[in-house]
A protein has these predicted regions:
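Glycine-rich phosphate-binding loops of nucleotide-dependent enzymes
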Residues: 1-190
Length: 190
């Protein structure tokens, strides 16, 4: 809904003080919002490098910065999108969104269906993005523990409405609320 691919039933989407509710997705992207779809949506018949540059905009995120962050993509830059593993495709989808140099990055289920080693690699990337690039990230993720570890604030939605809002660290330690909201039992830590 924030990106404009799902119709809103009520409410408004504001970004940087501007009502984006009625803008097409491409206009929202031009306003500084990057989006990584759950389905990845890379271009299978383009090379990695072509995927990265097809919608790129000038800024800190250029090919050199992307290849430094995603060494696997540098190694595979001449491969076609459909020749990449699922994890590499997800890296490419995130990297392509970064090449638009967004101020806000929306990540929809970025860890879904990926091998644990790839999930760990992407967690490191997201952590670096949050620490070094001054980029805001909205993370939609069903792996609650991972999401809470990565984020500062947590918002639990139920049918599109806010069911609960708290600091992520606070919610991580509130096992009763977690179990009530998402059915998650967090192992006690010593």
């Amino acid at each position: 809904t924030i990106m404009g691919y799902t119709q809103m039933r009520s409410g408004q989407v504001f970004w940087r003080g501007k009502d984006m509710s009625r803008l097409a997705p491409n206009r929202r992207a031009l306003g500084g919002i990057g989006w990584v779809a759950q389905e990845r949506e890379i271009f299978p018949s383009l090379t990695v490098e072509e995927n990265l540059t097809v919608a790129s905009r000038p800024g800190a995120w250029d090919l050199a910065a992307i290849y430094k962050m995603f060494a696997r993509l540098a190694e595979r830059r001449r491969n076609m999108g459909n020749q990449l593993s699922g994890g590499e495709q997800q890296m490419l989808a995130i990297a392509r969104a970064l090449m638009t140099n967004p101020a806000l990055l929306l990540l929809d289920e970025p860890f879904e269906g990926l091998a644990p080693v790839i999930v760990e690699e992407l967690i490191k990337v997201i952590t670096l993005l949050l620490a070094d690039r001054k980029i805001a990230i909205v993370l939609v993720e069903q792996h609650t523990e991972v999401a809470l570890e990565l984020t500062r604030d947590a918002v639990v939605l139920e049918r599109g409405a806010v069911a609960h809002r708290a600091a992520s660290a606070e919610l991580m330690h509130d096992t009763a609320t977690l179990e009530r909201l998402v059915g998650l039992r967090v192992a006690a830590t010593a």
